[in-house]
Amino acid sequence: MGLSSYLLDKFLNHHFKGTAAGTAPATLYGSIHSANPALTGANEVTATYFSGRASYTASNFSAPATLGNYRQIVSTASLNFGTSIAAGSNLPYFGFWDAATGGNFLGGFAFTDSLGSEILLNFGNGDTVSRASGSIKIGLDINAWSIYARDLQLNWLKGTGMGSAPSTNDVALATALTADGTITEITATVATGGRFSIPSANWSAITTVGNTRQIQTTNDINFGAAIAAATGFNAIGLFSSTNLIVFASVSTQNIVVGQELIIPASKFKVSLGNV
């Protein structure tokens, strides 16, 4: 469960391919699903049990906060489906859309109890069905994506736009790099031109890989020959101006003078999704 392919593509296009995410929805619409909605909103059964999707004000989520390896927002109001028109049993998932009917699927999630354990939704015909404030939690991992980027994405779901899309991203080499953007950078030490700039046009089309959406660079990332030695190189970061977007660990290695610092296009990939 997690974000839809529509939303994953929107975020990848914004961060890397120069197409802004655009206006964020002020209202989300909750749906019920009989099985995994996957990336597209499959298995929706809302109309079987209710007169329509549940309207929810997007701003009624908490500010993003770190919980373990995730940035998370939590509902601050109830999600009300209204009075059921048929009894429902063992319904496992709900989703959010940007319209009361049709529209774009934004993401699907399991129903959970107050402890975060997955549960099944059951109700009788004529019951009033709702999910209490605090029961809806949306978390995005910060294992490879920065806190800055995840907060942009979560706040978009809360109704706050992401602003203008960057026209370039810059690749940095480091001996230490964390999700909050703290970096021990060696790029300027080993590379004549410093960080390597990737124009938004130099990314591939977005493709599906497993439960993720993925892009890769269409040109090599070539820093040239190292102008100085460096020890303990173990991380690569991709920045938008001064803000870290994504990062990755690499096998620790020492850079020697004259070493060609090249990442082939086929090896530099960015994935966003539900792993």
Label every PLM stretch briefly:
Residues M1-P92, D98-N234, S240-V275:
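Small cysteine-rich, disulfide-bonded extracellular modules of the LU/uPAR three-finger superfamily
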